[in-house]
Amino acid sequence: MLDNTRLRIAIQKSGRLSDDSRELLARCGIKINLHTQRLIAMAENMPIDILRVRDDDIPGLVMDGVVDLGIIGENVLEEELLNRRAQGEDPRYLTLRRLDFGGCRLSLATPVDEAWDGPAALDGKRIATSYPHLLKRYLDQKGVSFKSCLLNGSVEVAPRAGLADAICDLVSTGATLEANGLREVEVIYRSKACLIQRDGEMAQSKQQLIDKLLTRIQGVIQARESKYIMMHAPSERLEEVIALLPGAERPTILPLAGEQQRVAMHMVSSETLFWETMEKLKALGASSILVLPIEKMME
């Protein structure tokens, strides 16, 4: 029996989002042993329970108020939302924030030897998918009628097996499509992981914990997107150096012992620092350029 005074968070037990979700919670300072086969794990240092479940169960657990928070792919969330609306329900939840992992796209794919002149080419065709509602919404908007072939796995083999004329499936690199004689022809939905919260009243202690967790998640994401940069630079070219680092805050400038014309610069940059940028910094006279990852960050 779950303790209702503890914050309940549902994450994917295994699969595409599992490792990233676990890493995010760990970097937020939640100490928990997720290396066992237990479906419910209790945090050691916070009143938090982690439920490890199938990804397509997470939206329902949040919408039905069984858990307080869930980390889920937007594609799975949107499919469940459309499914419930199709059954006459009015599902409610709050999206707290989009996360920086789990990126994918839901795409239409057809056999490589078939011509493609847009979605109209699928009119009257049979399409295999695990996302029938997202597919229907997209093709309805295009005025295309089709027959759906619902598969919960190995969707890419459907055309070769004679089950469908085309597929609608998640794509990352496209290698699986190519291996099955298919090509990606149209992206119908782009997705990332997101953090969602159940609708309705929340105990003050839980809401305070959620607010703390959101602040930490923001810090983790900012840290991953930022770099700490240190270098020595000519005093007379500081503004040129700073101009090469868009997104950087104004730097900390420190004197160098025994140097009158050069200073030490420290700054946080939210931009990716490419080799080309470092070469331009060097051309301006910068030296000892260090680019370091940031573990935690709070504004």
Swiss-Prot record:
Main location (coarse class): cytoplasm
UniProt EC number: 2.4.2.17
Compartment list: Cytoplasm
GO MF: ATP binding; ATP phosphoribosyltransferase activity; magnesium ion binding
Activity regulation annotation text: Feedback inhibited by histidine.
Any one Gene Ontology cellular component term annotated for this protein: cytoplasm
SUBUNIT field: Equilibrium between an active dimeric form, an inactive hexameric form and higher aggregates. Interconversion between the various forms is largely reversible and is influenced by the natural substrates and inhibitors of the enzyme.
Protein name (database record): ATP phosphoribosyltransferase
Organism: Salmonella paratyphi A (strain AKU_12601)
